[in-house]
UniProtKB/Swiss-Prot annotation:
<dbReference type="GO" id="GO:0032496">
    <property type="term" value="P:response to lipopolysaccharide"/>
</dbReference>
<feature type="topological domain" description="Cytoplasmic">
    <location>
        <begin position="177"/>
        <end position="424"/>
    </location>
</feature>
<feature type="topological domain" description="Extracellular">
    <location>
        <begin position="95"/>
        <end position="126"/>
    </location>
</feature>
<dbReference type="GO" id="GO:0044546">
    <property type="term" value="P:NLRP3 inflammasome complex assembly"/>
</dbReference>
<dbReference type="GO" id="GO:0032868">
    <property type="term" value="P:response to insulin"/>
</dbReference>
<dbReference type="GO" id="GO:0098978">
    <property type="term" value="C:glutamatergic synapse"/>
</dbReference>
<dbReference type="InterPro" id="IPR013518">
    <property type="entry name" value="K_chnl_inward-rec_Kir_cyto"/>
</dbReference>
<dbReference type="GO" id="GO:0033198">
    <property type="term" value="P:response to ATP"/>
</dbReference>
<dbReference type="GO" id="GO:0045444">
    <property type="term" value="P:fat cell differentiation"/>
</dbReference>
<dbReference type="GO" id="GO:0070588">
    <property type="term" value="P:calcium ion transmembrane transport"/>
</dbReference>
<dbReference type="GO" id="GO:0009410">
    <property type="term" value="P:response to xenobiotic stimulus"/>
</dbReference>
<dbReference type="GO" id="GO:0005886">
    <property type="term" value="C:plasma membrane"/>
</dbReference>
<dbReference type="Pfam" id="PF01007">
    <property type="entry name" value="IRK"/>
</dbReference>
<dbReference type="GO" id="GO:0009306">
    <property type="term" value="P:protein secretion"/>
</dbReference>
<dbReference type="GO" id="GO:0001774">
    <property type="term" value="P:microglial cell activation"/>
</dbReference>
<keyword id="KW-0812">Transmembrane</keyword>
<keyword id="KW-0407">Ion channel</keyword>
Length: 424
């Protein structure tokens, strides 16, 4: 009754609210697509249920290099501490077995007591002094008040063994630290790719293009680019292949993937019959579950180490009907690169159909170019007309201002009745 008499506002009536909610379509948030290669080049792959963990210990050096820095530093510190403690126990046992500790406890601790010539290691009277002597032996920082004598052949054996173990630990751990700092992927941090790839017409063909550049002046020798398309496919027998990799060629006059990366380059792939993008149109691209992986390989000029940079483009990162802007200009005899426009694109005329349809009906490209030319001419006409209108408005406003600033002529009457104009 309250609703009928409009005492309750209509926006609070439950029946109306329920009807409006039913009319509104429920749009669920689309889950982000899992990509095989991240934009940074890291492999987005998780290894689970590995049973034979011992295989990693068979190649211990590679395992140490592949660890994270915090784990490597912990192992680096613990290896030295454990070796020092182990040999400190051995030195203390040598002194304990020879009776050096009891001798110092009975006769006192004096340098002139004559005990130094009768003990294995001088001034090793506790575990703390044995630990300090172990550090002095392995790190070779120089002997102070503690030194070894000729009294115990066992002490000489322990000394030789600790020196060998210390050299092995130094070689392995320092080599591991060096390899981690000089890894090839560090050089790949200055190899950059455009955030988006584009599909546009080049030389009458639909082409898939992206831009790659090098921020350093030192070059990448024998640089090559490989492109792969990864997508989920189903065989005629019904087998589902979750990661189907297919190489696609790079447009190069010498029919090779090698490039000369002295300046940012636009890598082009012609979408032809061999391309997996041959049957994909602009509308189909949005719903495609594919990933284009780009791999750049080469040799670092300064170190001679082979490096590799990777990135990928999913369907949402491919812009149809765009082209990269030019960023290389010549200034005073030197080529200049503006990296602020590295990933900038502009919209260009491109057919929305697939490359197959374009090959079957070449007139589609001609019609698209004609339409773009007409639209370009119309935009130029509108722009020129706007400029003319603006210029006319400016001229009219200037005339009005000038007319308002004009001084009116004043006439004076002479006694004889003649008019005499005043000079302004």
């Amino acid at each position: 009754m309250l609703a009928r008499k409009s005492i309750i506002p209509e926006e609070y009536v439950l029946a109306r609210i329920a009807a409006e909610n039913l009319r509104k379509p429920r749009i669920r948030d689309r889950l982000p697509k899992a990509r095989f290669i991240a934009k940074s080049g890291a492999c987005n792959l998780a290894h689970k249920n590995i049973r034979e963990q011992g295989r990693f210990l068979q190649d211990i050096f590679t395992t140490l290099v592949d660890l994270k820095w915090r784990h490597t530093l912990v192992i680096f510190t613990m290896s030295f501490l454990c070796s020092w403690l182990l040999f400190a126990i051995m030195w203390w046992l040598v002194a304990f077995a020879h009776g050096d500790i009891y001798a110092y406890m009975e006769k006192g601790i004096t340098e002139k007591s004559g005990l130094e010539s009768a003990v294995c290691v001088t001034n090793v009277r506790s575990f703390t002094s044995a630990f300090l002597f172990s550090i002095e032996v392995q790190v070779t920082i120089g002997f102070g008040g503690r030194m070894m004598t000729e009294e115990c052949p066992l002490a000489i054996t322990v000394l030789i063994l600790q020196n060998i173990v210390g050299l092995i630990i130094n070689a392995v751990m320092l080599g591991c630290i060096f390899m981690k700092t000089a890894q090839a992927h560090r050089r790949a941090e200055t190899l950059i790719f455009s955030r988006h790839a584009v599909i546009a017409v080049r030389n009458g063909k639909l082409c898939f293009m992206f831009r790659v550049g090098d921020l350093r002046k030192s070059m990448i020798i024998s640089a090559s680019v490989r492109i792969q398309v990864v997508k989920k496919t189903t065989t005629p027998e019904g087998e589902v292949v979750p990661i189907h990799q297919q190489d696609i060629p790079v447009d190069n006059p010498i029919e090779s993937n090698n490039i000369f990366l002295v300046a940012p380059l636009i890598i082009c792939h012609v979408i032809d019959k061999r391309s997996p993008l041959y049957d994909i149109s602009a509308t189909d691209l949005v719903n495609q579950d594919l990933e284009v992986i780009v791999i750049l390989e080469g040799v670092v000029e300064t170190t001679g180490i082979t490096t590799q940079a990777r990135t990928s483009y999913i369907a949402e990162e491919i812009q149809w009907g765009h082209r990269f802007v030019s960023i290389v200009t010549e200034e005073e005899g030197v080529y200049s690169v503006d990296y602020s426009k590295f990933g900038n694109t502009v919209r260009v005329a491109a057919p929305r159909c697939s490359a197959r349809e374009l090959d079957e009906k070449p007139s589609i490209l001609i019609q698209t170019l004609q339409k773009s030319e007409l639209s370009h001419q119309n935009s130029l006409r509108k722009r020129n007309s706007m400029r003319r209108n603006n210029s006319m408005r400016r001229s009219n406003s200037i005339r009005r201002n000038n007319s308002s600033l004009m001084v009116p002529k004043v006439q004076f009457m002479t006694p004889e009745g003649n008019q005499c104009p005043s000079e302004s």
